[in-house]
């Protein structure tokens, strides 16, 4: 995909948890190398709290590096690194390892006090004044989706962006059998939600709002260290 469309961002979504009911998966490393990261079935834990309780930061470091190395081995030239469920915020030790990946691989990592706070953990010992952070982050809430106002949220976000760098987090996909199966019993961030994301950000309405509000689209390569 990157070879055919090199102008787009292709990041690595580091994954240490798996919330899905039927679409279960685990680490890329052998289980014997990272036993603290998995449940009795060899799958990642469903919740950040479980990761916080059981995971070894040394094993997390090994797994995160393995995921990045594997992606690069497959030919990906990553524009940035972020984290599924922002599970890297599960502890200061884990977050320290995550931040160090930026210097090791010379790839920007997503650091945000707001995302950290959303996990329920305190960032005070993890994010420092010298860290480059992105705080103008916009993401629809469960309430927006459940009240049928997710589309409206995105419209309002584009109409009220603050000056500077803004990041809108979305999960675009089709509301098809595959996505319904993956997200079964998980309506929040489920297939219907993802289809709304896809529909809005490919719509003429979105394009018009970008133009009307003089929003310049940038990518992670513009922020590359």
PLM region descriptions:
Residues 1-8, 15-76, 80, 90-225:
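Terminal accessory/targeting
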Residues 84-87:
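Conserved short loop/turn motifs at secondary-structure junctions
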């Amino acid at each position: 995909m990157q070879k055919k469309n090199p102008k787009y961002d292709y990041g690595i979504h580091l994954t240490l948890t798996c919330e899905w009911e039927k679409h279960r998966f685990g680490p890329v490393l052998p289980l014997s190398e990272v036993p603290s990261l998995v449940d009795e079935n060899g799958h990642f834990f469903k919740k950040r709290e479980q990761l916080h309780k059981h995971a070894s930061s040394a094993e997390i470091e090994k797994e995160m590096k393995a995921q990045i190395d594997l992606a690069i081995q497959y030919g990906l030239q990553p524009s940035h690194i972020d984290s599924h469920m922002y599970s890297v915020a599960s502890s200061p030790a884990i977050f320290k390892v995550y931040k160090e990946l930026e210097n090791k691989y010379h790839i920007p990592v997503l650091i945000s006090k707001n995302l950290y706070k959303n996990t329920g953990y305190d960032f005070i010992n993890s994010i420092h004044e010298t860290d480059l952070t992105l705080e103008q982050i916009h993401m629809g809430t469960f309430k927006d989706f459940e009240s049928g106002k997710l589309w409206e949220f995105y419209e309002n976000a584009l109409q009220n962006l603050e000056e500077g760098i803004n990041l809108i987090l979305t999960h675009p996909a089709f509301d098809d059998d595959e996505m319904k199966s993956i997200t079964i019993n998980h309506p929040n961030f489920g297939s219907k939600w993802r289809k709304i994301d896809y529909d809005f950000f490919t719509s003429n309405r979105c394009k018009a709002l970008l133009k009307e509000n003089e929003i310049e689209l940038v990518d992670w390569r513009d922020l590359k260290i």
